[in-house]
Every structure is written in C-alpha cells, then in structure tokens.
C-alpha cells in the first residue's frame, strides 16, 4: 500500500485519521506520518491495510489496470 492509497482509502471510507488509527490499533501520528510519505515498519502498514480491507476496500496495484494504482470499495 502506498501512502496515497492509504489516504484515498481512508477518504473513501469517510474515515478521519482517528478512525483508521483506532481500527488498526496504531497512533494518529503513525497514520499522518505514513500519509506524508514516512517509511514505517511493514507490519504497521499491513495493520492499516487490513483494517481498511475488512471494511471493503480493495487496493489496486500498478499493472492491475491500465490506469495504475488506486482503491475501490466492494459493493
């Protein structure tokens, strides 16, 4: 998950930083740092990704579509 995908997914879920932090059991500072491009431990990124995937987010990786990377929500 790229930082921009994290922000896109969070916005798609209509979550603030606090909601993602709570769902992933990380601090709000951690979410903010990641979205600004700071490198985090992979398990921390995985926790945020898993929390959003549990709410229906699908992460689209570069190469999966002609449009590049992004996010979508399962209907």
Q: Whereabouts are the PLM-identified features?
A:
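Short alpha-helical DNA-recognition segment
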Residues: 15-29
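A short, glycine- and basic residue-enriched loop/turn
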Residues: 17-18, 37-41, 63
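Short basic helix-loop element that most often maps to the first helix and adjoining turn
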Residues: 4-19
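Recognition helix of helix-turn-helix/homeodomain-like DNA-binding domains
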Residues: 25-40
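Hydrophobic micro-packing sites on short alpha-helices
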Residues: 10, 20, 48-52
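Helix-turn-helix/homeodomain-like alpha-helical modules used for DNA recognition
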Residues: 57-75
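DNA major-groove recognition helix of helix-turn-helix/homeodomain DNA-binding modules
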Residues: 42-60
């Amino acid at each position: 998950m790229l930082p921009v995908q994290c922000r896109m997914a969070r916005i798609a879920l209509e979550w603030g930083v606090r909601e993602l932090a709570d769902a992933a059991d990380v601090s709000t500072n951690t979410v903010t740092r990641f979205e600004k491009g700071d490198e985090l431990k992979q398990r921390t990124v995985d926790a945020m990704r898993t929390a959003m995937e549990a709410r229906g987010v699908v992460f689209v990786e570069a190469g999966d579509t002609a449009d590049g990377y992004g996010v979508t929500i399962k209907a």
